[in-house]
């Protein structure tokens, strides 16, 4: 499980609302992207075009997507909810 994100300084460095890129690394399975998008639609509804790249051995994949965020707390919430998915290993 990924460590919870809290007490960040996003509010000091970004003007909201703004697009924010998230990169999620997890175990390669057919449901990872769907699980991520399902959670993200609840927190930040929108149309997403995730970019998925498999690892060289095919055991992992990275999912990159851009979401419109409204505050630093919104970014933290997205990090915390998605990082709690069972197959997620790292999130940037």
Swiss-Prot record:
Annotated Gene Ontology cellular component terms: cytosol
Ranges annotated as spanning the membrane: none
Pfam family, one: DUF493
Family statement drawn from the similarity comment of this UniProt entry: Belongs to the UPF0250 family.
PANTHER family the UniProt entry points to: UPF0250 PROTEIN YBED (PTHR38036:SF1)
Name of the protein: UPF0250 protein PSHAa1021
